[in-house]
Amino acid sequence: MNTLDGSLSMLRNPAIIKFILQGVLFTLIISVAAVLFSIVIGTVLALMRNYCTGKQTGVLKALSVLYIEVFRNTPLLFWIFICVVFCPAPGFVDRQMFGLSSVNNKLLFKAAVALILYTSGVIAEIVRGGLNSVSHGQIEAGQSQGFSMLQIMWYIVLPQTFRAIVPTLLSQVITTIKDSSFLANVAVIELMARTKQVLSAANRYNGLNSINVSDVFVLFGLAATIYFVINFSISMTVRNLQKRKMSVKVKKTLALEERRQTGWAYNG
């Protein structure tokens, strides 16, 4: 396959397409799982940073600030290599699962841990922004009704926080999907790694500059198209949510203005 037509013929090979689509599936699974776990960890970190301000809980705030700043100001690839080398893998991943060998499963687990640790630092700041958007008066109102701080957070603050940050969280999903391509550096079987494996299997990518440019163009072009379709779809969802949110704000503003004008007319 020394021509572009020959390279395009790879896209008509069902085995190659299936192999790459499995990489897409693993990319989505890794990314969504990383975001979900990161939301839990990031929420805890944001709460610690915002509300652990007393003498007894000040150390928790300091730890959360340290965690967030360390992971937000260091590269993801660094943590991927650190976790691959030092992070222990639990016994349940040390076996064949999902059509993967035990070695691949351990790599997948360790790389996912790195992605979760890194992403949770980013999401902590997103959640903290949502927490800051909730009026402190609502917390005081909850306390006056006899609610505990835990109940106030669970029933009053966090629901409003997550409604406010949904578009930003979806944007973070896009970033995490793109960041997952770093996992190819440690042979985790996501989209980019599988694209490189297809080239390697065809003796078109051997690390010695022996590269068929047309094969690279076709396969990496396919990977880029897949990334674009997934992320553009999420991006459009974010835009629609933001437009809907702005529309609701405009309607509320217009309704309030109409009430004021009606009230002034009545008083006149």
Q: PLM ranges: what are they?
A:
Residues 1-268:
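Transmembrane alpha-helices and adjacent helix-loop boundaries
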